[in-house]
Regions:
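UBC/E2-like fold recognition across ubiquitin and ubiquitin-like conjugation systems
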Residues: 1-170
Length: 170
């Protein structure tokens, strides 16, 4: 049986990330028999509230990748305006190609088949450093980030960072 183009592309990207790791995250398969289910560990970026955290997330790739984007879900609890309460990540690069019916995103900000796991992860790390409060997935976190960044928001993030350190390698 021949490998599909998407499986071949994912295998190449995984091999490249293993050969040339990128600072700030590591990636691997959840199960060695399924190229479409990845687990990533993201290190909280320096000089951010997330610094010191080790956040686990899953990437689920569609069978027609790279024509459509993967879904990303944090497994580790995280308090962030662009991550909903169930852990789903909401950033432009992971949104289906085409027009944004809500008018928040330009077509070029959305998913393009040239994106890779590396570009996705760099975008997620950037999101941790600089949340987008204009298009929140977690309205409560966005409100706290805008109104009480150094108070309640910071306390909730610090709790998530501590918890992530305790459970990082479970």
């Amino acid at each position: 049986m021949t490998e599909t183009q998407s499986a071949l592309l994912l295998r190449r990207q995984l091999a490249e990330l293993n050969k040339n790791p990128v600072e700030g995250f590591s990636a691997g398969l959840i199960d060695d028999t399924d190229l479409y289910q990845w687990e990533v560990l993201i290190i909280g970026p320096p000089d951010t509230l997330y610094e010191g955290g080790v956040f686990k997330a899953h990437l689920t790739f569609p069978k027609d990748y790279p024509l459509r984007p993967p879904k990303m879900k944090f497994v580790t609890e995280i308090w962030h305006p662009n991550v909903d309460k169930s852990g789903d990540v909401c950033i432009s690069i992971l949104h289906e190609p085409g027009e944004d019916k809500y008018g928040y995103e330009k077509p070029e900000e959305r998913w393009l088949p040239i994106h890779t796991v590396e570009t996705i992860m760099i975008s997620v790390i950037s999101m941790l450093a600089d949340p987008n409060g204009d298009s929140p997935a977690n309205v409560d976190a966005a409100k706290e980030w805008r109104e009480d960044r150094h108070g309640e928001f910071k306390r909730k993030v610090a709790r998530c960072v501590r918890k992530s350190q305790e459970t990082a390698f479970d």
